[in-house]
Structures are given as structure tokens and as C-alpha cells.
Amino acid sequence: MIDVIVLGAAAGGGFPQWNSAAPGCVAARTRQGAKARTQASLAVSADGKRWFILNASPDLRQQIIDTPALHHQGSLRGTPIQGVVLTCGEIDAITGLLTLREREPFTLMGSDSTLQQLADNPIFGALDPEIVPRVPLILDEATSLMNKDGIPSGLLLTAFAVPGKAPLYAEAAGSRPDETLGLSITDGCKTMLFIPGCAQITSEIVERVAAADLVFFDGTLWRDDEMIRAGLSPKSGQRMGHVSVNDAGGPVECFTTCEKPRKVLIHINNSNPILFEDSPERKDVERAGWTVAEDGMTFRLDTP
Amino acid sequence: MIDVIVLGAAAGGGFPQWNSAAPGCVAARTRQGAKARTQASLAVSADGKRWFILNASPDLRQQIIDTPALHHQGSLRGTPIQGVVLTCGEIDAITGLLTLREREPFTLMGSDSTLQQLADNPIFGALDPEIVPRVPLILDEATSLMNKDGIPSGLLLTAFAVPGKAPLYAEAAGSRPDETLGLSITDGCKTMLFIPGCAQITSEIVERVAAADLVFFDGTLWRDDEMIRAGLSPKSGQRMGHVSVNDAGGPVECFTTCEKPRKVLIHINNSNPILFEDSPERKDVERAGWTVAEDGMTFRLDTP
């Protein structure tokens, strides 16, 4: 069994974004036609008791408060969180680590590049590596996600590189092949994928999606020039390291023949019209078989 | 006039703290006998329209959502926030800066030590200094808080050093005299103080409090060995850089003759019994003339 909780479904900045009065953000703020969403993160478990967090969003403190499965019970201090797996070093994927201070043991996993970005920022020393060991992920190799008591969780993780870009604050250092990851998690029977950022859908990614049972995929933008056309930013989706949902080469097109998995869009930017519940774009993606992720959604892959 | 909104009233970790099942945190989580609080921050304004944020807590995104006065209206992007003033470089005072990314101009003010700590962490480069200028505070000198349009806000800020300690993640670098600040803000008529962390109450601090109209003071712990006795941490209040509310040399005792100001405890740790609404300690501090800060509380100092 794999249980999944969507802790947050929005891209960096969240929905609404702090400084935005664009129509989507106003709708989310006033709860009229669009639901607010915190920044993207998943909780994953094989037993419904011990959880692994995929990306530590800046909203993690609030996400834990809103998610009873992640509340500690019993002794004075503790957590059902066994580990955190990072797909990249972007602010919206790592800032929540600063919430997980307070000398609480868990395992922190990420690529060499991402762990190096943490090491380059002394503030993350608040998570003492003696208490929160930092474990580099070996790409394309299945590793058992271990509970804190040393017993295998029942989940196997395979991290793989996907086209992306360096974190905004580290762009000057240039691009590294392991800077953006996809994660494949299996209980040996069913498989889920988490690919919240992806600049290009390769044939390898299509193969992985076709074989999976549940896929959370980069839903940042509807179209590549969306931010530019809306007057929100000079940056294209490609410049930000994201393929766009409805463009040629995007997930709707590329995964159209992948009929096995449940397909979910996550890491959705506040400019994306699929966030409006009644928009034509929302109807389009739903008609194409996609679910638009919301905070608090749960998914279960049952072992037959 | 000075308007103040308490954006958050809790110490680092917030209330409840993510990994705590101590009685206070359970009470806050279940809303039985104690109100939840986000991490300490104030918003201050001379006109109720343009605001300055004192400390950028990790909860700042949620705090802005919960505070209509801080919502931008009108154009696509913007903010009523004119500037952010930091009292120290602790995680609970600076992490919220990462929420204020998105190329939105405002002024960032802090001591040389605190600005150096930001510079030592490239992640804060997400706030491009070309867009968010970093202005070192000159201690003990009144400076006009300027709105973004270059017009004085009507508020004068004086920052002064108080006994404290280096941020947790920078303790190895040793202590610096300007690492912990108190802030005095006046409209030329009324004066408020913000001293969320203070390891020792000096005669200078007593003089400032006696002359002020509104004081927000370090309410981290009730007694110095509170965390140790509760089995929560091996650290004393002194080790964490905080004088304790009810100890000899604490604010209740030292400011007992300061009858002019309204006195408010802020930056309250989740172990502090004053967070229980019906506790004897809560009654004690209220009887001594103190208010225990809550998120969303507002204060106004009127100019006669």
C-alpha cells in the first residue's frame, strides 16, 4: 500500500502569492472560484503511520498543523516524519527544513548538488547533521526508505535526473546534471512518481509515466508565455525550468497514451488558469484525464 | 498615530511546535485552553496604509494572508509593505524574507552583523539587493522610516543593542555587540518599543521602557530552567539569550515601576505557562499589568 497526502499543490509563492492582486490570487484570497493552495509537497507512507515528506515547502509548519497524520502523539517530543526527500534546491522545496529544527532526528535525502546547496548556506546548520543525517541519493538506483528505528518502511525510492535548472539563488554557479530530480516510489507492487519540476519530457520520462500507477507532474504553467502575457514577469516557463501543461511537448500531449496511471498536476503557479474551478482550461485538463491537485487531497495505491 | 498589528506572538517553532506533544502544544492544536500563535512579528504604520514589518517570521506568508491590511489591491503586483526591520539573525526573525521574493521592492534594515549573516547565506540572494536594498542600521541614532515613494512615513526608528546571543546557526562565529537589537519607534509624540529577545535588563532598557507608551518585550520563558524541568531541552533561558518573565531581573520585576506604558509580552515559547488562558501564571502577569500577546491583536497610539 502507498498512502499519499497532498500537503501543498502550488508552485513557489503559493496561491495567493503575497504581493499579487492578479485575478487568480484575488479569487483564492476571497474564496470565490478558486481554492487557496500552499507550496508543493507530498507526504507518503506505506503504513499510514510513518511518513516521508517529498520537498519541504516554506509552508511546512502550517501544512503539518493542517494534517493530523503528521501530529506527534504520546511522548513530549517526536514526529511521524521519518525522512525528507528533496527533488531540487529551490526555495520552495527546501525552506521548510528550517521548520524541522528543534533537534528532532530524521533522514534528509537529496542529490549531491542539492546537499551542496544546503551546505553552502550555514542557516541549514540548524539541522545538525549529527541528528539529521544528510544522505546523498544515488541516481537510478532503488534504495529502501528506512524508518528511524532502522526497519525498512516498505517503500523503495528511485531518484532520477530530469531536465531542469539551477535554483534561482544559485544560477550563477551554472547548471548541474543532478540539480532537478524525479522520484519513483514503489511498495514492490504499485508505483507512484513525483516530478514537480521538469523542463522537457524525455522518452525516458514517458516510459516511467506509462508504467506507473499514480503520477504527480509539473503543472506550473498552462502555456510557456503565460507570465509574460499577463504582465506578471519577463520570464517564460522554459526560462524557469518548466514545460507547460498545454503546450506541444507538455504533459497533456506527451502522456496522452499513458492510460494506466492516475495523473495529477501539482506545483501549479498562481497564474495558471486551471486554478479557476470553472475555467475552460480546467475543463480541458479534466477531460484529458488529469486531476488538478488541491491541498489535503489523499490518494491510496492498494496492494491487491 | 502609530498603528500596530501583532502578526505573530510565539517564539521560534511557534505554538504548537511541529514536533511537540507537550501539554501546551496539545492545547493549542486542539483549541482547548490555549490559542495557537505563529512566530513573532509586528506590523507598524503611521497611516494605516503603509506598513513596516518588524522581523520576518517563517510564518510570514500565512500572516499576510490572515491580515487584510497587508493585502495588495489595484495593480497586478504590489504590497503595502514599505520595509522590514530585523532585530537579529535568528531563523525565526529572518526566514520570512524568503516569502518576500518575487522582485518586489522594499527596504531591508538590520544591524551590520545581521546583514552579514544574510550575506553569508546565498539563499537570501533571492531578494536581489538591487530591488530590495539592504540598509545597515546605525545604532542609537534616529532615522526616518521612508516609504517606497521616498516620502517619510512619519515614523522615526532608533535601534539599540541589547544583551543577547548569536543566532543558533552562527554561534561558532562568536558574539557580536550588534547581534541583538531593540527597536524604538516614534511618531514624534508617542513611542513604542519592540524588544523580542533580551538576555539581561540593563538600566538603559528600564529608562527606555519607563519613557515609552507601548512596550513589546521578550516573554520567551516564565522561568530560566523551564525547558530543562519540563524535559524539553537541556538549555536554560540564559543559554538561549533570554531573561525570564518571572525571575529576579526579569521584566515583571524590573519594569514594575514603569507605569506609563502599556506592557505586552511577545515571543512566547510554547513551554511558557502564561499561554494557558486559565493558568495561575497568566493571572499573575495580567495582575502585574501585562498583556499576553495574541496573533491579530491591534494597538493604536493616538496623537492628541
From Swiss-Prot, chains A, B:
Keywords: PQQ biosynthesis, Transport. Pathway: Cofactor biosynthesis; pyrroloquinoline quinone biosynthesis. The keyword Transport applies. Coiled coil: none annotated. SUPFAM superfamilies: Metallo-hydrolase/oxidoreductase (SSF56281). It comes from the Bacteria. Pfam families: Lactamase_B_2. GO terms for biological process: pyrroloquinoline quinone biosynthetic process. Belongs to the PqqB family. May be involved in the transport of PQQ or its precursor to the periplasm. This is Coenzyme PQQ synthesis protein B.
